[in-house]
């Protein structure tokens, strides 16, 4: 059954959101192929993307960024730590806070991951002109830089 979002009666913002979601969903196979190639779970990929080498992050902050609870992140980090990709230590000012950092091996794998995910432009975006790609990038940056309501 058609809905307002498929018949053109949705607001421009709702239609844009639906199209962004559709674009992301169209790349799921690519994401899973990279996960398989690098022997990482999708959750490990998301975590590794968010951990920048040399910039330790509190495990609770990573949990918030991933939209899950600390116990889920503990399992994700356990597996990354077992592979020598991240380190975990107590916080300098509060020993209850667990800080995460990327190891040199993790930084190398992270670089491979980012290259495989982002160096090749997906076909739907490659079809846009350079000016359209720039406009889309600028609009998305503006949307993401805006404070949440």
Where do the model's predicted regions map?
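N-terminal leader segment of winged-helix/HTH proteins
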Residues: 1-38
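C-terminal regulatory/oligomerization modules of transcriptional regulators
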Residues: 1-11, 131-149
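N-terminal positioning helix adjacent to the helix-turn-helix/winged-helix DNA-binding module
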Residues: 12-15, 43, 105, 132
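Short, locally clustered residues in the helix-turn-helix/winged-helix DNA-binding domain
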Residues: 21-24, 49-53, 114, 141
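Charged, amphipathic alpha-helical coiled-coil/dimerization segments
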Residues: 28-29, 78-141
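N-terminal helix-turn-helix DNA-binding core of bacterial DNA-binding proteins
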Residues: 29-69, 83, 99
